[in-house]
Amino acid sequence: MKTPLTEAVATADSQGRFLSSTELQVAFGRFRQASASLDAAKALSSKANSLAQGAVNAVYQKFPYTTQMQGKNFASDQRGKDKCARDIGYYIRIVTYCLVAGGTGPLDDYLIGGLAEINRTFDLSPSWYVEALKYIKANHGLSGDPAVEANSYIDYAINALS
């Protein structure tokens, strides 16, 4: 998994050198940010179910046809609604992984890489997940540095879906 720190180490190693003072300063900066990131990950994890359910409702309000159309990829029955909440929960989980890892690696490796294919295969609209992520960003209850950290990964996911 790529993070700014692992990339700096890999570059220095491939060049047969130690980390430069600038690279070390970046690493120390990352460690200072780590506390805010871990606070954000902890908060998102503890609120994951309520955030996912709120995001599901936001999607249904903006796209009411998702609860009216029949089919396995829509939320016309409880099974479909459960799948929607599960999928939104995956996004929350991956964002928390990014917060812990300190980089977009988890989003890049586990979600974005195959996202277009998954959405196409299962006839899922990225706009549903954009709406869900916007809800999560607006309602996670974080402030200060933890909010900045969480929002950066949420925005990254939104941009990847857009």
Curated annotation (Swiss-Prot):
- Residue ranges annotated as transmembrane are none
Top-rank lineage group of the source organism: Bacteria
| Cellular compartment(s) | Cellular thylakoid membrane
Key words of the record: Antenna complex, Bile pigment, Chromophore, Electron transport, Membrane, Photosynthesis, Phycobilisome, Thylakoid, Transport
Mention one GO biological process in which this protein takes part, according to its record.
Answer: photosynthesis
Instruction: Write out the residues that bind (2R,3E)-phycocyanobilin.
Output: C84
The family note in this entry says:
Belongs to the phycobiliprotein family.
Question: Can you name this protein?
Answer: C-phycocyanin-2 alpha subunit
UniProt organism field: Microchaete diplosiphon
